[in-house]
Design a protein with these regions (language model features):
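Acidic, Ser/Thr-rich intrinsically disordered and amphipathic helical segments
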Residues: 5, 33-36, 47, 62, ...
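Short, compositionally biased
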Residues: 82-90, 138-151
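Extracellular/cell-surface secretome signature
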Residues: 41, 97, 136-144
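Primarily a LysM-type cell-wall glycan-binding module
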Residues: 17-41, 67, 73-97, 154
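Extracellular LysM carbohydrate-binding repeats and other cell-envelope/extracellular binding modules
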Residues: 20, 45-77, 102-138
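A positional/structural detector of protein chain ends, strongest at the extreme C-terminus
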Residues: 3, 150-154
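Cleavable N-terminal signal peptides of Sec/SRP-targeted secreted and luminal proteins
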Residues: 3-18
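Residue-level signal for mature regions of secreted extracellular proteins and peptides
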Residues: 11, 15, 27, 53, ...
Length: 154
């Protein structure tokens, strides 16, 4: 009984917990994933995970309908995004959006040096302006990346 009550209250609590400087937010609906929210609202998957690392777990499987998530924070809200598809490379993304190597990595610090950890469905910030993000939860990103990487082979 207590567990059911706690689960029912969780979305309400998460919507009450305000993230300092949150500039925009979204309400989770049934079937949402971190990547689908990112695509729907034009926010990078990295940024979504970063600003919600206190409420979204490592596999992004604890989203609850009615839960409010922050999409961006003041001065760190990239809204020019691209969704990775099969066979994408960082070089291709850079050329397509006219962004430098430094800017791509600055706006997507989770990408490794070889750019072999981007995954199909990941939403990247492709703005030509560089954003400086606070420290990110590398464990959360890696859990997302390695959860979806096998689909790159399809």
């Amino acid at each position: 009984m207590f567990v059911k009550l706690a689960l029912a209250v969780l979305p309400l609590l998460s919507s009450v917990l305000a993230i300092d400087g949150c500039t925009r937010n979204a309400t989770v609906v049934s079937g949402d994933t971190c990547d689908s929210i990112s695509r729907k609202y034009g926010v990078s998957t990295y940024q979504l995970a970063l600003v919600n690392d206190a409420t979204i777990d490592e596999n992004c499987d604890n989203l609850q309908p009615g839960q409010v998530v922050c999409l961006g924070i003041e001065e760190h809200d990239c809204t020019k995004v691209y969704t990775v598809v099969a066979d994408d490379t960082c070089d291709y993304i850079q050329q397509t959006y006219g962004i430098s190597n430094e800017t791509l990595w600055s706006n997507n610090p989770q990408i490794d040096d070889a750019c072999d950890n981007i995954y199909v469905g990941e939403v990247l910030c492709v703005d030509t302006e560089s954003y400086t993000y606070p420290q990110y939860n590398e464990t959360l990103y890696n859990a997302l990346a390695y959860t979806y990487l096998p689909y790159c082979d399809e």
